[in-house]
Amino acid sequence: MNPSTTQARVVVDELIRGGVRDVVLCPGSRNAPLAFALQDADRSGRIRLHVRIDERTAGYLAIGLAIGAGAPVCVAMTSGTAVANLGPAVVEANYARVPLIVLSANRPYELLGTGANQTMEQLGYFGTQVRASISLGLAEDAPERTSALNATWRSATCRVLAAATGARTANAGPVHFDIPLREPLVPDPEPLGAVTPPGRPAGKPWTYTPPVTFDQPLDIDLSVDTVVISGHGAGVHPNLAALPTVAEPTAPRSGDNPLHPLALPLLRPQQVIMLGRPTLHRPVSVLLADAEVPVFALTTGPRWPDVSGNSQATGTRAVTTGAPRPAWLDRCAAMNRHAIAAVREQLAAHPLTTGLHVAAAVSHALRPGDQLVLGASNPVRDVALAGLDTRGIRVRSNRGVAGIDGTVSTAIGAALAYEGAHERTGSPDSPPRTIALIGDLTFVHDSSGLLIGPTEPIPRSLTIVVSNDNGGGIFELLEQGDPRFSDVSSRIFGTPHDVDVGALCRAYHVESRQIEVDELGPTLDQPGAGMRVLEVKADRSSLRQLHAAIKAAL
C-alpha cells in the first residue's frame, strides 16, 4: 500500500470513528487517494457519499447535511481554486456555528512558489473564518514507522473533529484540514491480507474528547413586565415559557405565548430577555437599542451578544424569581391577536399576489413533522409576519451571515439528512416532507445545486417553492425602494432577470410546475416522489403599499 493511500484510508477511518456519516466529494486528481478511500467507505456502508462537480454548491450541501443531522460533515476537494470556492460556505458555517470540515488535498509543500501547476498557499487561506487550520505532513514510505505515523495521523484527525464540533470550546464551526499528497495518487495492487493501520478497539476514536459545558447562570426577576426575543441559535429555556416571546422562525418554540414582531411597538416592556442572535425584524432592533429598557442576553456560545451596546448582563441560562403579571400577559396576548389579524385582513384585501401571500399559504399548508427551509431574504421574514406556528416543525435557514447563496443546496442537504434520520428510526417507506420557500433570485443564484448525478443520493420528498417576483423584492421595503429612486432602483436593486424557471428545471431533469397561490396547499398535500419545484408568480411593485397598509391597520 503506497503512503498516500495509507494516509487517506487512516484519515477517513478516523473521521468515521469521530461521528462523520456524510461526505461531499468534488472530483480532482490530487485528492484521488481521499476519493478512493471515501468510495470504499461508502460501499461498505460506513458513510454516505455525495459527489458534486461544483465546490460552491458542495459546501452548502454539506452545511445542509450538518444542520439537518446535527453532526460534522466533510467536503473534500482537490488543490487550488477548488479550495477557494468553499469561501462563502466557510463564512456561513463560521457565524452559524456549523461543524463543516474542509478536507483539501494539496501539492507537496516544497512546490509552493515554484510555478507548479494548480498550486497555491492554501493552508491558512480561510484565516479567521475557521476554528483551526490543520495540516498533515507528507506520508513517508517508511514501513518501520507505520505505527508512529498512524498515531500522528489519527491524533490530528481527532483534533480536527474536536475543533469542528466545539468539544473543547463549546463553539462549533468550520475547520480546514489540508493534506499534501505525493504521487502515486492511486492504490497499488495489494498483496492478499493488506490492511489499513488499525485504530482503537471497538471502533472508538483515537483520542476521545468529552464535550465541555458552558454554563453562566443569570438572575432575572420575571415580575417586571418582560418580553423574550428569541433569535437564531437560541437554546431551549423552559423556565421562560410563560413569557410573551417574539421567536424568529429558526428559534425553538418553547412556550404558549407567542408575540408577533409587529406587536412590539404597541407594548411598553420594562425589560427584555434576548436568546441567541436576532437578525430579522426592525421593531426588535429598535427595542433592543432602547436605553430605557434593560436587556439580558442568554446565548449558547462565546460570541458577544450585544449589537446595540445595550445589554445589561450576559449568560447562558436564567435563574428566575417572581412571576409575570397576569395583566401584562393578557395585554401581550391581545396585541398578538391584533397584529395577526391586521396582517391577515390586509393580505385578503390586497388585490395582487405578493411574496407575503405565498409565505402565508406555505405556512398554512405545513403540518407537524415537516421540515421547512427558508431563503435568507424575504421568505424568512414573511413567514414570521404571516404568524407561522412552528410547533412540531423543524425550521432551517442560513442565518450565519444571511446570504442568499447556496440555499438550494442547503435545502437538498437538510432534506437528505432529515430523511436519513427518519429511515434509521421510523418507517423508510414514508419519508418526511421537506419544503423550501425561496425567492427567485435565491433560486437562480444556486440553480446549479439542482445538478445531482444519476448515481447520487437524492431527496425522496423535497418541494422547493419559488416565489417569483422577477427580482429582489426585499429592496422594495428598504430605503432603496423609496419612490424618489424609482427611475433607477428597479434596475440596480430589483435586478429583473426574466429567467424561465420551468426551462431551468427541465435542464436539470427536475419536475416543476407553475401554480397559483391558492393552489399551493392542495398541491403540497399531494405526495411527491423525489424533488420538485413549484413556481408561484408574485408581484413586488406593491409590496411597499401592502406593508404600509399593515402598519396603518395596527
Curated annotation (Swiss-Prot):
One of its GO terms (molecular function) is 2-succinyl-5-enolpyruvyl-6-hydroxy-3-cyclohexene-1-carboxylic-acid synthase activity. Its cofactor is Mg(2+); Mn(2+); thiamine diphosphate. InterPro entries: MenaQ_synth_MenD, THDP-binding, Thiamin_PyroP_enz_TPP-bd_dom. The keyword Magnesium applies. Keywords: Magnesium, Manganese, Menaquinone biosynthesis, Metal-binding, Thiamine pyrophosphate, Transferase. SUPFAM superfamilies: Thiamin diphosphate-binding fold (THDP-binding) (SSF52518). Pathway: Quinol/quinone metabolism; 1,4-dihydroxy-2-naphthoate biosynthesis; 1,4-dihydroxy-2-naphthoate from chorismate: step 2/7; Quinol/quinone metabolism; menaquinone biosynthesis. Its EC number is 2.2.1.9. One of its GO terms (cellular component) is plasma membrane. The keyword Thylakoid does not apply. Homodimer. Was identified as a high-confidence drug target. HAMAP family: MenD (MF_01659). Belongs to the TPP enzyme family. MenD subfamily. This is 2-succinyl-5-enolpyruvyl-6-hydroxy-3-cyclohexene-1-carboxylate synthase. It comes from Mycobacterium tuberculosis (strain ATCC 25618 / H37Rv). The lineage of its organism: Bacteria, Bacillati, Actinomycetota, Actinomycetes, Mycobacteriales.
